Amino acid sequence: MFKLFTARQHDKIWDFDGGIHPPEMKLQSSTVPMRIAPLPDQLIIPLQQHLGPEGELRVRAGEQVLKGQPLTVGRGRTVPVHAPTSGMITAIAPHTTAHPSGLAELCVHITPDGEDRWREQQPWADYRQRDKMALLDRIHQAGIAGLGGAGFPTASKLQGGLNGIITLIINAAECEPYITADDRLMQEHADEVITGIHILRHLLQPQQVLIGIEDNKPEAIAALQRALRGQDDIHLRVVPTKYPSGGAKQLTKILTGKEVPFGKHSSSIGVLMQNVGTVVAIKRAVIDDEPLIERVVTLTGDALSSPGNFWARIGTPVLYLLKLAGFKPQNPPMVIMGGPLMGFTLPSLDVPIVKISNCILAPAETEMGLSEPEQSCIRCGLCVDACPAGLLPQQLYWFSRGEEHEKARNHNLFDCIECGACAYVCPSNIPLVQYYRQEKAEIRALDQESARAAEAKARFEAKQARLAREKLARELRHKQAAVKLTDADQQTVDAAVSRLTRQSDGSESVINIPAGQMPDNSAVIAAREARKAQARARQAEKQQARSTEETTDVVDPRQAAVAAAIARVKAKKAAQVQHVTTDVAEAGSEAIAEDPRKAAVAAAIARVKAKKAAQAQHVTTDVAEAGSEAMAEDPRKAAVAAAIARVKAKKAAQAQHVTTDVAEAGSEAIAEDPRKAAVAAAIARVKAKKAAQAINPD
């Protein structure tokens, strides 16, 4: 059949392995003109509607926005989203989105004001006057992502293909059953499709541009042919209907005969592909300055009384659109986002339309058939024959069930396009695509965890290396600080080193003691005796020097006179002390004989007088010695010193007399005890005698 089809074609096309021919079910909606869905009461715009991270919010709750105003911003693979209409942001909160998991994502809730007022627009009538980077930035700021289902950021994809693209392919196959959004778009907006192709051709400068469309769309083919009239640089290729001929790798093989290697993209062989809906969005963004805020959505299925295609604003709830198409709820309820083979059942009808939502399928109870239970694999091999990617679905199924992630990866699991052909032909009703999706998610989660661990390890190693460098730097600084010496310090150090060297040269040799023998200490003993002899000699020299000085002092007449004066003073003081002592003794003996109390008083007075006499004698001696030194130097000074000595001696005698009077006055307080008085008197006599001897030892 394929050979008969290609025989009638002027341009050569190829075929791909595998594929199936399910019922098309397209006539329910392809023959009905498109309608414009009115604005709902509330729009729910998810921040992430593409393959990449979500953008940074630029609005807040309670703020008024205009139609086309950016809600988020971003660069690279972060595609911004825009306000589909003018109104107020009532909330920024999580909401369930169109995803198989049914998880909630952050969304902007907008209540339309009914005015639908645009932000300021700046159309580009002649895009050829703009450079390529300006065009790419315009496409990026418009928030355009692939509308065929993948949602890859269009600007990033085009920027990667600025160099080396040979063939530009426009994907108009739309091969999955029930879906007719691209079909109706080409029928009613063929001119915009061709204008968008020219913009891409201006950007990429490919050698050839091909439009691939299946032969089950005669009205769309005719509309494109009319729009291409007189243009020979764009070629329309009609291909036989076969699922999934709309896959990127499969359509590339059909139109060019080239196969994309495992793990690679079509750009690796010089091919870049864009969907028809994406091309129209590019045209409106570049020329009309309209961001991607609406798209064509197919509403079909036997549960709808008026199926068709609608221009729906991004963020419109699914239930609102279903009501526009005459939705009749089924039991059990089933609404599918996407087609019957690649779509998924919605967890809630309150989820919003997003940029990659091309179809909402609401089948009746009997339309999809009864759901039969899953059975064991019988290894029939039908899934292998149907796989358009040349994989081994049976092996991938076992690896996914057994959580053998590396084996699944090595068997090219990520080359699976999840077309559902294997599950369609499986006689055991095994939902193979669900297993593959789950396995891909688990592998991605493990890869992310490994990447985080590697990043943490790299940070730790970098920290350790930094600490080691800082430690080495500190040690180097310490060494440099310790070594830094001034010239004077260096000279001092050198001098000390030289002294130590000389001392070590003159020092005694080290004594070695053989094992088992007693040490010979004779040398040490001799050295010690020599040091003692030297000490005795130095002591004798000092004594001789002192005696010589005394002899010299006596020979000198002036010093002799001073010495004689000192001797007379000492003799006089000794006589006085002796007289005082005798009087004290006599008074004490008389007091003892007469009254014990008086004896105690006398003893106390004697002690005080003896002490004062000794102090006076010491002062007089010091003064005399000082005067002798002065006299030895000068006779006039000697006379002055003698006068000063006489005055000091007189004052000392007066102080002694006062002290004696005080002692006599206090003697009345002595306790009345004969024995204690006798003892005190005896002690006083002894102390007085000792004081006299100390004053005059001669």
UniProtKB/Swiss-Prot annotation:
[4Fe-4S] cluster 2 binds at residues 387, 416, 419, 422. Its main location: membrane. [4Fe-4S] cluster 1 binds at residues 377, 380, 383, 426. One of its GO terms (molecular function) is 4 iron, 4 sulfur cluster binding. It comes from the Bacteria. Keywords: 4Fe-4S, Cell inner membrane, Cell membrane, Electron transport, Iron, Iron-sulfur, Membrane, Metal-binding, Repeat, Translocase, Transport. Its cofactor is [4Fe-4S] cluster. GO terms for biological process: electron transport chain. Pfam families: Complex1_51K, Fer4_7, RnfC_N, SLBB. InterPro entries: 4Fe4S_Fe-S-bd (IPR017896), 4Fe4S_Fe_S_CS (IPR017900), Ion_transpt_RnfC/RsxC (IPR010208), Nuo51_FMN-bd (IPR011538), Nuo51_FMN-bd_sf (IPR037225), RnfC_N (IPR026902), Soluble_ligand-bd (IPR019554). Binds 2 [4Fe-4S] clusters per subunit. Its EC number is 7.-.-.-. It is an enzyme of class 7 (translocase). It is found in: Cell inner membrane. It is a peripheral membrane protein. The keyword Oxidoreductase does not apply. Residues 366-397, 407-436 form the 4Fe-4S ferredoxin-type domain. One of its GO terms (cellular component) is plasma membrane. Signal peptide: none annotated. PANTHER family: ION-TRANSLOCATING OXIDOREDUCTASE COMPLEX SUBUNIT C. HAMAP family: RsxC_RnfC. Part of a membrane-bound complex that couples electron transfer with translocation of ions across the membrane. Belongs to the 4Fe4S bacterial-type ferredoxin family. RnfC subfamily. The complex is composed of six subunits: RnfA, RnfB, RnfC, RnfD, RnfE and RnfG. This is Ion-translocating oxidoreductase complex subunit C. It comes from Yersinia pseudotuberculosis serotype O:1b (strain IP 31758). The gene is rnfC.
